[in-house]
Structures are given as structure tokens and as C-alpha cells.
Amino acid sequence: MSKVILTTEVSGLGSPGDVVEVKNGFSRNYLVPQGFAVIWSRGGEKQIEQIKAARAAREHATIEEAQDLKSRLEAKIVKLTVKAGQGGRLFGSVKTSDIAKAVEESGIGQVDKRKIEIPNPIKGTGNHEATIRLRDDIVATISLQVVAAK
């Protein structure tokens, strides 16, 4: 058995910075060559403590940024201009990429289209809602105003 320090998330073993004990072949043939871990040493453990402290500080900063973005998203109505036919029926539907682009153009900030969830397909003009999962614990609900292009 050999001790290694994980440098990335490895399912079943742990998160970056964890010191784990694995079989020699697993560490020598898989973890170390793939860059998932480094061989344990006293100096390496001190370095890992510094990395964990820096990661905790970054984590705190990203939480504050996400809270700020959430308040800006919920305070403003995002306007989407799309092609529509008679009666306000859209040609197609509004996609998450359209919402992400509209949020960025409105000056609120950048949002990843994969984090946007639309509860019901948007196939008509009017007011709608969508949720954006900024982090696992921070979810913003945005108001959308879908308008027909002229």
C-alpha cells in the first residue's frame, strides 16, 4: 500500500488535497501517470495545506459573486425578441442559448446555457420564467419578456 495526495477529484477515493492509501499498482500505473495524484511526502502535505487554504478563499469569493449575480438577475426583466407569427405564436421555441445570450446583452452578466432550466417550453410571446442554477445551493429565478420581432 502506498500513500498518495490527490490532485483532482477521483470518484470513490476523494477530493483534491486528500491523502489516501491505495494499492501500489493503482497509484503507479493509473493515478500518478494520469496526473490524478502525486506520491505522498511531508513537503507535499504542506503544499496541499496551502492549496486547500487558497481553494477555500476562492470558494468564498465565488459564493459572493453568485449571490451578487442572483440579485441582479432577479431585479431585472430580460427581454427576448424572436420571430413570431399571427397571435404571438413563435416559429420554434426559446432555447436556453437564447436566454443566455439575452442575459449577456442586457448587461447583467454571463450565464452558462447549461445551467438554465425552462420549466415549460416557451412557444408564445408574453411573460415567462426560467431558473438559473448558479451553484448547487444558489438558484436564481429570472423573468423573461418574449416580444415578437417586427
UniProtKB/Swiss-Prot annotation:
Keywords: Ribonucleoprotein, Ribosomal protein, RNA-binding, rRNA-binding
GO cellular component: ribonucleoprotein complex; ribosome
Coiled-coil residue spans: none
One MF term in the entry's GO annotations: structural constituent of ribosome
InterPro entries per record: Ribosomal_bL9 (IPR000244), Ribosomal_bL9/RNase_H1_N (IPR009027), Ribosomal_bL9_bac/chp (IPR020594), Ribosomal_bL9_C (IPR020069), Ribosomal_bL9_C_sf (IPR036791), Ribosomal_bL9_N (IPR020070), Ribosomal_bL9_N_sf (IPR036935)
PANTHER family assigned: 50S RIBOSOMAL PROTEIN L9
Function: Binds to the 23S rRNA.
Protein name, entry field: Large ribosomal subunit protein bL9
Source species: Clavibacter sepedonicus
Underlying gene: rplI
